[in-house]
Amino acid sequence: MSFCDECFKGVTHEGTPKGKWEKIGGIDCYVGIPSGIEYPKDKILLFLSDVFGMQLINNQLLVDDFADNGILTYGVDYFFGEPIPADAMQPGNTFDRDGWREKHGYEITRPAVDAVVAALKEKGVVAFGTTGYCFGAAYAVPLAIENVTQVTAVSHPSRLKVPEDLEKYCSVSKAPFLINSCEEDAMFPAEAQAKADVIFGDGKFAPGYRREYFPGCKHGFAVRGDMSDPMVKAGKEGAFKSTVEWIKKYL
């Protein structure tokens, strides 16, 4: 499980979270429920966060924003209340990243996602979409490969094997695939972005494929970007808009 420095950097956003915490299948989830509008209650967007987890206000506000757009959204706390703390974004912070990594590998955290999916199915949910950010993309892609989910969006994905994971996705998944990419991203660099276009583009992936590109943005922009930078603000807002449109089109 590898990371880049930008995985741990960013800006904490301001706002007042409107969602609520629920325990689903024994796992804490931050839930955004649409208010004042009709929405499908049997279709769920799984919000799969970066390393700062659902405790980070940025992630909570994004869940709320999806709900405001009529999408019932569950942010899964697959770090079991132990994400990397928000103050680890501060320069000079000495948080033990390596120690945290050892305790939160895929094999340890993926069962939490599966438990939430199983519990929601028992409640009558029939379709799932995912929006995965950085760390969360490494759940979104396998879920699509296993055809557990019906539509996928990822933003500045990390921990993917390129081209292997992309080729497998293209060959077996039925979930339309959106990638929000950016100019500076050590985890999904220009070479990986181009490879994705070769694998999925030009109609090769029948369910649907699109890759958005946001110049002037770095890895993490869609969650922790500095909104005082006009290009980063445009990137964050653009990635959110494209994700909402993609999820609404296919879920």
Segments predicted by a language model, with ranges:
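N-terminal cap/leader regions of alpha/beta-hydrolase-fold enzymes
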Residues: 1-251
